[in-house]
Amino acid sequence: MTAEKYTFPANYGEFDAVFREYRAIFEKQLRTVCDSFCDNGAKYKALYDAASYSLEAGGKRIRPVLAFEMCRVCGGDINNAVPAAVAVEMIHTFSLIHDDLPCMDDDDMRRGRPSCHKAHGEAVALLAGDALSAYAGKYICDSDLPAEKKTAMIKELYDRTLGMIEGQTIDTDGKFDTLDGLLSMYEMKTSELLTAASVMGC
């Protein structure tokens, strides 16, 4: 984990201010992570440029913020929630890259700019999503957390990732016989990673 040390926001009187401070912590750490991709070598530059392109595209960062706040509620050290925040956002970003591909939703735009496959090509985008899925677990493994905490985090992360993928499978099939079935699909696609962020942060 990075040598950078963070502290919880001092004032909890205004939600928007706390949210912004959590986001600022996350964005600073994410910049460090994306910079570290350069260490993987020039021959993988296209892969990690695409991964960084999507990771740094913005978004609300609800999942990292949730990990930080659950850590605070549980009385933890925010620095121990950083691996959870980064890993969950990597998985979320991988899912968005794949979701935008022509074989899925075929979306040309994501967060106000060309989607990953439009900017970097379909093959590289597919591999960038795969790389982020793998890197999420690696990031936790490489952290300074105790071994048992790493194991618990990784299990939670990939259990929930599988649930998210199963939800996307239902969406791809496009057959919803009942409202409950439709809601179940949305629940799996969205709530699985929100749950992961909450559990991993605590």
Q: Where are the model-predicted features located?
A:
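N-terminal amphipathic/basic leader segments beginning at the initiator methionine
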Residues: 1-34
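Mg2+-dependent prenyl diphosphate-binding active-site environment of isoprenoid biosynthetic enzymes
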Residues: 25, 31, 41-202
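Short, N-terminal intrinsically disordered low-complexity segments that are rich in Pro/Gly
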Residues: 12-20, 36-41, 55-56, 126
